[in-house]
Design a protein with these regions (language model features):
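Glycine-rich, N-terminal phosphate-binding loop and its surrounding beta-alpha-beta segment
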Residues: 52-82
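Active-site loop segments of alpha/beta catalytic cores
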Residues: 1-30, 36-38, 51, 62-66, ...
Length: 340
């Protein structure tokens, strides 16, 4: 029962037995488990890799996400600032793009020269060497729409969708190239099996289906195709409601979509089963963080029962998990799938 092999079968829309189970993200949780601060991690590939591998040796997630917890660091490499805190991931301060008319001035070569990003690249190679036989290793970043919002500021981007759509499109083109450039060193090194992206600002809680179709999906599709041409599948998570855009996500070429816990799993499977693998969707806060082991087992079993035997399904939390989720609860999530 190799978790990686089970996941790969599900990703190809097969029906592995047992059902694979995975976290989404999990970086901040793994680092908290290791007692490591981001100031320490950012300068030490060994420490990053050790935290990720040690956590996964305890829980057996089918997928690991190198760079989870660091998704704002590319913005810092491109000119924004980060505010380090005692606990949790650093907060993004300011924007790398002050004016949409100056998007072309964004120097993407800074992604290649950034020490923190190099730390993650080296860590991925160490993780792949240590657990790559049993865990599907990915690099992770924001997807183009959210990446653009982090570069320019989400409130300003929302206004510009109406006031300056051409300027937004120019920003999105640049953000799409930045996302590709961010992941490229991992692909060239062969240190990952796939690419993961998160796109919280493309949620139905933030933008309409029409705006998603106009501003988010085309750039998601473009970068997904570039990764696919190199043989790397894309895994995606969007926070919140995505019921009205699941078909568009599948149309973008996404191989595996990890649902938020607020999305109806049964309805999602009705829409896209057979088109892309679905992960979902145990509540990460009310069940995994605040619930008991029994609560986790019951919620996991409910998801497994809903998914049934139709294939292309992975048991996952409905988002990244908080740093304070008890280890026993994560173990219960994975164990319930692997023992089912």
């Amino acid at each position: 029962m190799n978790p990686k092999a089970l996941f790969q079968e599900a990703l190809e829309l097969g029906t592995p037995k047992p059902t694979p189970a995975s976290l989404w993200g999990g970086g901040a949780w793994a680092f908290a488990l290791a007692g490591a601060s981001y100031r320490e991690l950012v300068a030490s590939p060994d420490l990053v890799a050790q935290a990720i591998t040690s956590a996964n040796e305890k829980v057996g997630s089918a997928v690991v996400f190198v760079g989870s917890g660091f998704t704002n660091f590319p913005m810092a490499a491109l000119g924004a600032s980060l505010e380090f805190k005692e606990k949790g991931a650093p907060a993004l301060v300011g924007q790398a793009v002050a004016d949409l008319a100056q998007v072309d001035r964004l120097d993407l070569d800074r992604l290649d020269a950034d020490q923190a990003l190099q730390t993650l690249q080296k860590a991925a190679a160490l993780v792949k060497e240590a657990i790559g036989a049993t865990a599907y290793v990915t690099s992770i970043s924001w997807a183009p729409f959210t990446f653009a919002g982090r570069l320019y500021g989400m409130d300003r981007l929302m206004t510009a969708l109406v006031d300056d759509p051409k300027g937004v499109e120019a920003l999105l083109e640049r953000a799409t190239e930045a996302v590709f450039r961010y992941h490229l060193p991992y692909l060239e090194a062969g240190s990952v099996d796939g690419v993961a992206m998160a796109d919280p600002m493309a949620s139905g809680d933030v933008i309409s289906r029409r705006h998603f179709q106009q501003f988010a999906q085309p750039y998601l599709a473009k970068v997904t195709q570039r990764f696919a041409e190199r043989g790397y599948p894309v895994l995606l998570h969007i926070c919140g409601r995505t019921d009205d855009r699941l078909d568009l996500i599948a149309d973008a070429g996404v191989k595996g979509f990890f649902l938020d816990h607020r999305v109806d799993l049964a309805k999602a499977l009705e829409v896209v089963r057979g088109r892309m693998c679905i992960g979902g969707n145990v509540d990460p806060v009310n069940v995994l963080a605040r619930g008991t082991v029994d609560d986790v087992v019951q919620a996991a079993r409910a998801c497994l029962e809903t998914a049934g035997d139709g294939g292309g399904y992975v048991l996952t939390p409905g988002c990244d998990i908080p740093p304070d989720v008890p280890l026993a609860n994560v173990q219960a999530l994975i164990r319930t799938a692997m023992g089912a």
